[in-house]
Amino acid sequence: MENRWQVMIVWQVDRMRINTWKSLVKYHMNVSKKARKWLYRHHYDSNHPKISSEVHIPLGEAILVITTYWGLQTGERDWHLGQGVSIEWRQRRYRTQVDPGLADQLIHMCYFDCFSDSAIRKAILGQIVSPRCDYQAGHNKVGSLQYLALTALIRPKRRKPPLPSVQKLVEDRWNKPQKTTGHRESHTMNGH
């Protein structure tokens, strides 16, 4: 019998970002209790030698599994040191991979406070709007006009430490152009 390969999408992430993600998950599971239903599996709980950790997030009947890997093939850049993350949605025997934005939306649907359906009406009538949205990462694109109006009216609290975001975990911070402020342009470089 020949070998069968299974391909998975693994987002390349640097080690420090994975460590930050793990500590945020553990904090909100054990201290703040906002993610108390989540399950954290250490590397020694897995049979796979490349798995660093797994976070199982129940979403109703389904489970979102965020797996971190180590010892992977290094990337084309020096800082791609063989660390990665995969995001999988499981329900019974069905499994599929999801992107980080969708993962954050799925997490936000089941966990962390957001504006209630009656928040717009309450805001128009001048009543106190409660609860406020705690998980900004769950709204990955420009929201509805009502959501934008509510966020302008009720500023979200800055949480210390922040809630764990999958999109923030896999964000590519290496290939973004550097933003420099307060520096004048080099006239010799611009040809002026």
UniProtKB/Swiss-Prot annotation:
Induction cue: Expressed late during infection in a Rev-dependent manner.
Description of post-translational modifications: Processed in virion by the viral protease. Highly phosphorylated on serine and threonine residues.
Region feature Membrane association, mapped onto this chain: 171-172
Region feature (Multimerization): 151-164
Membrane topology: Peripheral membrane protein
MF term (GO), any: metal ion binding
Residues covered by region (Interaction with host APOBEC3F): 14-17, 74-79
Modified residues (Phosphothreonine): T96, T188
Sequence motif BC-box-like motif, residues: 144-153
Cellular component, GO annotation: host cell cytoplasm; host cell plasma membrane; membrane; virion component
Annotated Basic and acidic residues bias: 182-192
Region feature (Interaction with host APOBEC3G): 40-44
Region Interaction with host APOBEC3F and APOBEC3G, annotated ranges: 54-72
Region spans: RNA-binding: 75-114
Positions contributing to Zn(2+) binding: H108, C114, C133, H139
Region of interest (SOCS box-like), residue spans: 151-180
Other facts: Vif-defective viruses show catastrophic failure in reverse transcription due to APOBEC-induced mutations that initiate a DNA base repair pathway and compromise the structural integrity of the ssDNA. In the absence of Vif, the virion is morphologically abnormal. HIV-1 lineages are divided in three main groups, M (for Major), O (for Outlier), and N (for New, or Non-M, Non-O). The vast majority of strains found worldwide belong to the group M. Group O seems to be endemic to and largely confined to Cameroon and neighboring countries in West Central Africa, where these viruses represent a small minority of HIV-1 strains. The group N is represented by a limited number of isolates from Cameroonian persons. The group M is further subdivided in 9 clades or subtypes (A to D, F to H, J and K).
Assembly and oligomerization: Homomultimer; in vitro and presumably in vivo. Interacts with viral RNA and Pr55Gag precursor; these interactions mediate Vif incorporation into the virion. Interacts with the viral reverse transcriptase. Forms cullin-5-RING E3 ubiquitin-protein ligase complex (ECS complex) by interacting with host CUL5, RBX2, elongin BC complex (ELOB and ELOC) and CBFB/CBF-beta. Within the ECS complex, Vif interacts directly with host CUL5, ELOC and APOBEC (APOBEC3F and APOBEC3G) substrates.
Name listed for the protein in its UniProt record: Virion infectivity factor
Native source species: Human immunodeficiency virus type 1 group M subtype J (isolate SE9280) (HIV-1)
